[in-house]
Regions:
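Internal insertion modules embedded within essential enzymes
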Residues: 102, 152, 668-680
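Intrinsically disordered, low-complexity linker and terminal regions at domain boundaries
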Residues: 70, 78, 87, 91, ...
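Short, low-complexity cationic-aromatic patches
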Residues: 104-108, 610, 656-658
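Acidic/polar residues at beta-strand termini and the immediately following turn/coil
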Residues: 49, 115, 309, 400, ...
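Non-cytosolic beta-sheet module surface loops
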Residues: 37-39, 104, 607-609, 668-670
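Charge-lined substrate channels and their catalytic hotspots, especially those that engage the 3′ end
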Residues: 1-245, 252-297, 329, 336-337, ...
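Short beta-strand segments
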Residues: 33, 54-56, 85, 100, ...
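Electropositive polyanion-binding surfaces
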Residues: 141, 146-148, 165, 175, ...
Length: 716
């Protein structure tokens, strides 16, 4: 056998990799693996095997044309002494995507797409005739027409959409959407299909539905909302007994399964909420008009109607298709003001006191106060049953007419928000129980559940060790209920304290992510054995699925195909995460843009994160978060103590600990990368600083003898 034949046979058996004609490279004992490749800006790329084993390092020179997210085949390289295990990409099996977003640079002969971060070792080359009118500085979406291979070293593409000039607010928000493969405009044919829907309520609709048009009904939403998913109705049935209706827009009546509108809704799976806009799941005609439960208009709804006693115990319920007519559209602020002017103190959990001789103040006050009273009973019972208290505040911006942020603040959930929340939770739980809770020996029919697994035990133990540093104790062993009670006790103890936000953040990291599945395991955070999403079909596709299945089962239909619905659940969970990432990026962009107006200014802050490459700090005044890069900590060589969430100086022993108060200056902003850099003015949390400086004989501003500012620094 010729040597070349032998090498070809060895290549077939994965002992060798063919590099080019008559050229081969030796694999490590023929060990070949498949998995995902992740490109890093610092060149320290990683390969994560499909089998879940330890990720491997892939040097830039061994990465071929692989991009982040690509499925690749690698050969595991022989391990060198004192080196981490490495791999070499030998084949790109599947590219994660074929369109990319960046900034155009047009030159004499060719044009280039410059992508944020480190997409590839070189920019994407675009023939000038494929620019679609794009100019230097424009943001554009480019489709790859040629991947690098043995014959072509460059990555080539063509412009499919020019978004517009860099820096324009609409362009930057659309850029974020495009980077995640999310839609930034609605297909014309889908909008045309929506325009043909009349929204007319027919005599057949009236005959088949329960009529709630004579019962007081209202919506309570954010002041700028247009898509009113849900409404509440209330009337007294007798002494100590109330009928409360949770009425949900009947989207599935208008959006038929498999229709062109439905196919687009499946693809999107969720509405997307950026800082200054909503990208709806459904066409505007449906989400803001036909389906939206607007005041003084007859609307079709799918309702869960409860009979509740004064302790909010469910005495009876029914799930029915209805016709409603909202009497009043409230915003949260209006209802909150009404509650407070009638004696409710927000956050205490106490309902309004008994009315005076003239009754409660405000329009429909008696009914709204009764809804609040019942909601507080529901909330109290939920926490008794083991629900976890995580009241995270939302970062908000005031935006001017040009899209520029003028104010940054946190918005806290108040009693009016919690009123709506509790009835939505009750409806979702009840719908899930109506299908999933069956007699022993029977099999429940298919339904998408919203599931939330128990916390990661190792992360809970890390949390326990972390909070000890602040003087808190926490038990991590025991039942689900015991874990929830321990978490709630910790949240109550640190509420309002300087370290409260950081502790809550570390606690959240111990939690698993909620997701959709037909395989029910319950919901740890809410302490529900059965839970689904039924109450927001205008903005979440799983709710539309649930509406259709409930209708099907009410009509005597058989259980739906499990595999089909599990696939849809996985898709919706994935799209929910993608949408959340886009929302987070829009917040980062506006945060950096806002702080760009404060370059050189000093602020009080606290350390909100510690990594090997730097310290994250959150400004106390406006909650904007930036980073102090490790390269700027030039007074010592710092070691990263991951277990204790801190950096410790080797010579001076200065310590930067998660949660420490700190004084920072705004040093740099980079809108393109959404990066905000700070420098440290003083570390108020370091109790060792003065002592160690004296021991080292170093004055303020001086480096310890023999130290170098660049030594050991890691760039971001």
């Amino acid at each position: 056998m010729l040597a070349i034949d032998l090498m070809e046979e060895m290549a077939w058996d994965d002992f060798l990799s063919k590099v080019s004609d008559n050229s081969y490279r030796l694999n490590n004992n023929g060990q070949v693996m498949e998995g995902r490749f992740q490109r890093k800006p610092n060149g320290k790329n990683t390969f994560t095997p499909d089998d879940g084993s330890t990720p491997l390092f892939v040097a830039e020179r061994n990465s071929m044309s692989a991009l982040s997210g690509d499925r690749v085949k690698v050969s595991v390289m022989a391990r060198r002494q004192n080196h981490i295990k490495e791999a070499q990409v030998i084949e790109v099996l599947e590219h994660a995507k074929d369109t990319f977003v960046g900034k155009l640079r047009v030159e004499k002969e060719l044009a280039f797409l410059v992508t944020p971060g480190s997409l590839y070792t070189s920019d994407i080359i675009i023939p000038k005739k494929k620019l679609k009118g794009g100019k230097t500085g424009d943001k554009a979406v480019v489709k790859i027409t040629q991947w690098p291979d043995s014959d072509h070293k460059n990555i080539m593409g063509e412009v499919v959409d020019v978004l517009g000039p860099t820096g324009d607010n609409d362009v930057e928000m659309n850029t974020i959407l495009a980077q995640y493969g999310l839609p930034y405009k609605y297909p014309k044919n889908v909008e045309e299909a929506a325009d043909k829907i009349t929204g007319e309520i027919t005599p057949e609709d009236e005959a088949e539905r329960e009529d709630f048009r004579q019962t007081f009904t209202c919506t309570i939403d954010p002041h700028d909302a247009k898509d009113f998913d849900d409404a509440l109705s209330i009337k007294q049935l007798g002494k100590g007994l109330w009928e409360v209706g949770v009425h949900i827009a009947d989207v599935s009546h208008y959006v038929k399964e498999g229709s062109i509108i439905d196919r687009e809704a499946v693809k999107r799976a969720t509405s997307i909420y950026l800082v200054d806009r909503t990208i709806p799941m459904l066409p505007e005609r449906l989400c803001n008009f036909i389906c939206s439960l607007r005041p003084d208009e007859d609307k079709l709804a799918f309702s869960v109607v409860f009979n509740l006693n004064d302790d909010a115990e469910v005495k009876d319920f029914r799930i029915v298709h209805t016709i409603i007519r909202s009497n009043r559209r409230y915003c949260y602020e209006e209802v909150q003001e009404l509650l407070e002017q009638n004696g409710v103190v927000d956050g205490t959990g106490q309902p309004a006191p008994a009315p005076g001789p003239k009754g409660y103040k405000g329009e429909n006050a008696d009914l709204l106060i009764q809804l609040d009273r019942l909601a507080k009973k529901l909330r109290e019972q939920r926490f008794k049953n083991g629900a976890v208290k995580f009241d995270r505040e939302e970062l908000r911006f005031d935006i001017d007419e040009k899209g520029h942020p003028t104010r940054c603040y946190f918005k806290r959930s108040k009693d009016a928000n919690k009123l709506i929340e509790e009835f939505m939770l009750l409806a979702n739980r009840t719908v899930a129980e109506s299908v999933g809770k069956v007699k022993k020996g029977k099999t429940a029919k298919t339904l998408p559940y919203r599931i939330h697994d128990n916390p990661d035990p190792q992360k809970l133990e890390t949390l326990r060790e972390f909070v000890v540093k602040f003087g808190y104790k926490m038990k991590t062993q025991g039942t689900k209920g015991a874990t929830a009670r321990a978490l709630n006790k910790l949240m109550d103890a640190c509420e309002g304290k300087p370290e409260g936000n950081v502790i809550q953040l570390v606690a959240l990291r111990a939690m698993m992510k909620a997701k959709y599945s037909i395989h029910n395991i319950g919901h740890f955070g809410l302490a529900f054995d059965y839970y689904t999403h039924f109450t927001s079909p205008i903005r979440r596709y799983p709710d539309t699925m649930v509406h259709r299945l409930i209708t099907r089962y009410q009509q005597g239909g058989r259980s739906a195909n499990k595999d089909h619905y599990e696939e849809l659940c996985e898709h919706c969970s994935d799209m929910e995460q993608v949408a959340a990432n886009a929302e987070r990026d829009s917040i980062k962009y506006k945060m950096v843009e806002f702080m760009g107006d404060h370059l050189g200014e000093e602020f009080d802050a606290h350390i909100s994160g510690i990594q090997s490459f730097g310290i994250y700090c959150e400004i106390d005044e406006n909650h904007c978060e930036g980073m102090v890069p490790m390269r700027d900590l030039d007074d010592d060589y710092y070691d990263f103590d991951e277990r204790n969430y801190c950096l410790v100086g080797r010579r001076r022993h200065n310590r930067y600990q998660l949660g420490d108060p700190i004084r920072i200056k705004v040093a740099r902003v980079n809108l393109e990368k959404k990066q905000l850099d700070f420098t440290i003015i003083s570390n108020n949390g370091d109790k060792t600083k003065k002592k160690t400086e004296k021991e080292d004989g170093a004055k303020d501003g001086e480096k310890p003898k023999g130290s170098k500012s660049s030594k050991g620094k890691r760039k971001r």
